[in-house]
Amino acid sequence: DVIKMLYRKVESELSPRERLVLKMRYGLYNEEEYTQREIAKHLGISRSYVSRIEKSAIEKLREYF
């Protein structure tokens, strides 16, 4: 199942921060969906840094699909 494989890759290939950003951004694991600005405020980092983390995480996952 592709969804199960994706979740396994999220857990095994991404850093804790990358996982958190994707979980918050896309509402994974029953999380609420947040904007990049909201995530940045929650983590105490800039919105542009959240964007870079998100992009990096998606690129890592793209290698497998």
Q: What residue ranges belong to the model's regions?
A:
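Transcription-machinery-associated regions
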Residues: 1-65
